[in-house]
C-alpha cells in the first residue's frame, strides 16, 4: 500500500507502508477559520479523533488519502 505523507506546491510525497499497516489516513486539526493542520500517513487501525477539532478519514487503496 502506498500512502501520501505530505503535500506542497511541488507535489505530493508518498511512502510504502510497512507490513501490518494496511490503511492510509488523513487527519485535519482545526485551528482557526480556513486553516487546519493536516497529517497524512499509514496506520494498522484507523486513528480515533482525540478532540472535537479533529477529523480523521481512513481508506484502503494507493494514494487514497490525497
Curated annotation (Swiss-Prot):
Source domain of life is Eukaryota
Record organism: Dendroaspis angusticeps
Q: What else is known?
A: Negative results: does not show interaction with adrenergic receptors (ADRA1D, ADRA2A, ADRB1, ADRB2), dopaminergic receptors (DRD1, DRD2, DRD3, DRD4, DRD5), histaminic receptors (HRH1, HRH3, HRH4) and serotoninergic receptors (HTR1A, HTR2A, HTR2B, HTR2C, HTR5A, HTR6, HTR7). Does not show interaction with muscarinic receptors (CHRM2, CHRM3, CHRM5).
Name one molecular function that GO assigns to this entry. toxin activity
Can you say where in the cell this protein is located? Secreted
Tissue range of expression?
Expressed by the venom gland.
The family annotation for this protein states: Belongs to the three-finger toxin family. Short-chain subfamily. Aminergic toxin sub-subfamily.
Which residues form each disulfide bond in the chain?
3-24, 17-42, 46-58, 59-64
UniProt cross-references to Gene3D superfamilies, sorted A to Z = CD59 (2.10.60.10)
Specify whether Secreted is a keyword of the entry.
Answer: yes
Q: Which GO terms describe its cellular component?
A: extracellular region
Protein name according to UniProt: Muscarinic toxin 1
Q: Briefly, what is this protein's role?
A: Shows a non-competitive interaction with adrenergic and muscarinic receptors. Binds to alpha-2b (ADRA2B) (IC(50)=2.3 nM), alpha-1a (ADRA1A), alpha-1b (ADRA1B), and alpha-2c (ADRA2C) adrenergic receptors. Reversibly binds to M1 (CHRM1) muscarinic acetylcholine receptors, probably by interacting with the orthosteric site. Also reveals a slightly weaker effect at M3 (CHRM3) and M4 (CHRM4) receptors. The order of potency is ADRA2B>>CHRM1>ADRA1A>ADRA1B>ADRA2C/CHRM4.
- Keyword entries, A-Z: Disulfide bond, G-protein coupled acetylcholine receptor impairing toxin, G-protein coupled receptor impairing toxin, Neurotoxin, Postsynaptic neurotoxin, Secreted, Toxin
Amino acid at each position: 500500500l502506498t500512502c501520501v505523507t505530505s503535500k506542497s506546491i511541488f507535489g505530493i510525497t508518498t511512502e510504502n507502508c510497512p507490513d501490518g499497516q494496511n490503511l492510509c489516513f488523513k487527519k485535519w486539526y482545526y485551528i482557526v477559520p480556513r486553516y487546519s493542520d493536516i497529517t497524512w500517513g499509514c496506520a494498522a487501525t484507523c486513528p480515533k479523533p482525540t478532540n472535537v477539532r479533529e477529523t480523521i478519514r481512513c481508506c484502503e487503496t494507493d494514494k487514497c488519502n490525497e
